[in-house]
Structures are given as C-alpha cells and as structure tokens.
Amino acid sequence: MDGLPGNLVEPPPHERAHPVGNLDDLPRIMITAEEAYPVLEALFLRAREEVRMGFRIFDPATPLYSAEGRAVGRDWFDLVLHTLCRGVDVEVVISDFDPVVASETHRLTWRSIRMLTAVRELARAAGAAGRLRAVAAMHPARVAPAARLALYGNIRAEVRERIAWLGRMEEAERARALAEMPGLDRWIHGSGGRMRPVRWPVPDLVPATHHQKLAVFDRETLFIGGLDVNERRFDTKDHDRDAPQTWHDIQVLVGGREAADAHAHLGRFLDEVALRRPVAPSGGTILRTLSTARRFRGVSMAPEPAVAEIEEAHVEAVGRAERFVYLESQFFRSRPLAAAMARAARANPSLTCILMLPAAPEELAFEGREKVDMRYGEFLQARCLRKIRRAFGSRLFVGAPARAVRHHTDGRDTLRAAPIVYVHAKASFFDDRLCIVSSANLNGRSFRWDTEAGVTFADPEVIRAFRLRCFDHWLPDDAAPEARAPGSAVGAWTRLAAQNAAAPPQRRRGFVMPYEFEPGERFGRDLVAVPEELV
C-alpha cells in the first residue's frame, strides 16, 4: 500500500489503533465507533473515582480500539478489571429483553452479566478497591393478561420457534443456551427432542426496553448518543466493509451540569419506571423518555408514558425552525412529529429539510425478516414520509447512504446496485440554533415507551460545527459550497443524489443517494388496533 515502507501492509480497521484526541476539548461530536470507542476507553482510563453507565448492549468481549486501551488488555473485560484494580467504582445497567420474542438479545445480556460477574470475582481476588455493580434490567411494564390471551396463538408460535432452534443443537450446546436465557426456560416443557410450549399461563410480554446509551465519569464528563458497545457496532467513517457490517452512529462528549444530571438520572430511573419513586422533574439539561408499569393494566398492550421530553423538544423545535431542519435517524415513524413538520412546512414557505435514513430496517435488509411487526413499521414510515413530502414538496430531500462500489442482490441491502450503509444515528438540527443528540429514534417507541436519554446544544458555533461534520461525512470531498450551506443544501443534495443514482456505482461521489419510497410502500401493512409505539 502506498505510503508504507517495504512490504508492510496496513492492518484492517478493526485491528488498527485509533486515536483518542483531547478529552478536554468539549463539547465534542464523534462519528462512528471509530471515533467514539477510543474516547470511551480513554475516559475509563482517566476516571478517578466512579463510572456510571446505562446501555442497551454492553458486551465485555468487545475489542479495545485505542493504543491506550490496548496497553492494559485486549477487550472490555480487561479494561473494566483494570479500572477496578485502580480503585475506581463501576456501575452499569444493561437492558434485559423479553425472553420469548427477543431471546437473542436476552441471551446476550445474560452472557454479559456472567462475564462481568467473573470480572468482579477476579478483582476481589486481586484485592481491588474498586467495586462493580452490574444489573440486567428488564422494563417493568407487561402486556395485560387479556391482550396476551388474544395473542395466545402468536406467542405459542414464537415459543415453538425457539424450541425448533434449540432442537437443532447438540445437548451440551442446548444446555448452555438455556442457561444463558434464564427467562425462557419457564415457558418450555420437557427436554431434548421432547420440548414443547407450556400451555398455561400465557407467557408474559415485555412491551418496552431501556434503550439509552450513556456513561458518566466522576460526575464530570458525559458520553451520550446512539451507540452501544459491541463488536457489531464498530465501523469506520469510510464504511469500507460489507453492508451488514456497516454501522453509522453519532455520540457526543459534554461536561458540567449535563454530566451531573445524567449521573443522577442513572441512579434513579429504575425506581422511577417501577413506581418505587416519583419521576423527577426535568433538570433542563438531559432530555428523557420514561414510561412506567401501569397500576391498572386492563386490556392495554402499552406501558404508561411518564416523560416525553425528547418528543416534546422535537415538536417544539420544528415549529420554531425558520430556514432549515436536518435529521439523521434509524426510523421516521412518529405521526405527531410528521404532522408537526407538515404544519411547519405549510406555514413557512422558506423552511427546508434534509432527512437521512437507512434504505431499509436492519432486520429486513440483512436478515430477510418479514414478520408483521416489520411490515407495520414500514407502513408507518411510508405514511409519515408521504405526509412531509406533500407538505414540503421540493424543499425536502430524503436520502439513504450507499457506498460507491458495485454490489447487487435481490434484497434491500442493495440500493441502486450498491451496498447500503446502515444508519443508526439519532441527531437533529434546527437552523443553527438547536441540536439534539440522543438515543431516541424518530418513532413512537422512542418518544413514548422506551427509556431514552439525550442532550441539547444551543451555541450556534457548536451546532454549526457539529452539523458540518455530519454533512462532510456524507458529502464528497469536492462538494460545492452550497451543499454545506443551510439555505441551499436541499437543492445541492437533491442534485448530487440524482447524479449518483444515474451513474455507475464506482463513479458516484460521496454516500448521498435518494431514498427509495416504493419498497416500503409496497411492503408495509397496517395493523388494526395495534399502537404505533410497538415499532
């Protein structure tokens, strides 16, 4: 490779050590795990007294990606152990999941808990002063018995799928899998080739999860956004990998009051959602979504929404936007937000909008999953996109990123003969006056049901710098100046996307492609009487 002496070959991205930068340069935006993971590792190494975290997924087997991290070990198992041995307390809440309908992530959670338990025992044996508290936290809300009874056949079918999967394993592997899914075993009768679903009672269903992704260090520094910690989520800014391995995400680093408030939130949210204490009022720095268990479930499938600060902030910001809105999200399925955007577009002929989405949901693009929940999600997104397209007209650009290489399949992992880049970021910009970075997607689940957390920025210089970093990530290096300016960006991105779509993949510039509306319109299906927050 050019620039390397002799026969040296540059190692692949997952093997290279990635730079950390100045941890005191705050606030800071990090694009992809290439930038974010080394920072998180360095923050652990710098922590003096305590680390408090809440993640949907936190896998201690995740490799370390910074030179600083690799100086103490190979993976997060080693880094957490090293941190405890330095006398730093570590507390982590990892989301647990419905063992029937989300058994894979349920298993991952308990595998992580077992690994962290081993870390704690090793630290104790070494005489470490630091204490580790690792909690697997399932949301306390449950689907009401009457609603579960109506879904009896569907639930038993899910259990049968798990039994079929277990039945294909050797006995030792099956025993290990069941041990790693402590919530599933109670819904299965028998063993080996004689397993069958329990007839009664109907298994519980857990409608919500703790979806937040944040870590606080010494109550002074906050790492927050859309990125969990596992090897699947590692990607670089050039996304130079197969489509199913791409993962575009955004995380920010802030200090001061936001860190202190996030620390307090992590210390109380489990009691709040379980109705063991009142939900704290907003502190003004951290935006949250919180829902609680229902005191009276009746026939409801839903938790009780308690705090919807992220949704409220988006709806209010859209109404106040004057010139430009820029959104990156995994989903765009919130009817209230789509309605607010449509109202704002009709009321203000000067308002423009860029919305960047993945070309398809992850499970549909890479796993071929076509169950009813996937169809319902696509139905909602297609409806929301229709609403804002009618209102904005040519003042709206909806994009989906793809790499500039040829790749063709019959599935939705391909966009115009190129591999898609999977978007998981959750960042929203309103003019250069407000920016929201959070764990919340633009859908009812994130806005009303799941536990979410985010921060806002109001400094125009900071917001502009963050927005330009987002723009420059997608745009080609030689993009025209109008592609970076709010007043002209929509037209410039629309033209660039059209040029890319018309060109062979290898001649395209940047990642910007037009989102294709027809596949979602065709695939989506409405579900009568099912709350949109389900997806």
Located regions from the model:
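Charged, low-complexity intrinsically disordered terminal segments
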Residues: 1-535
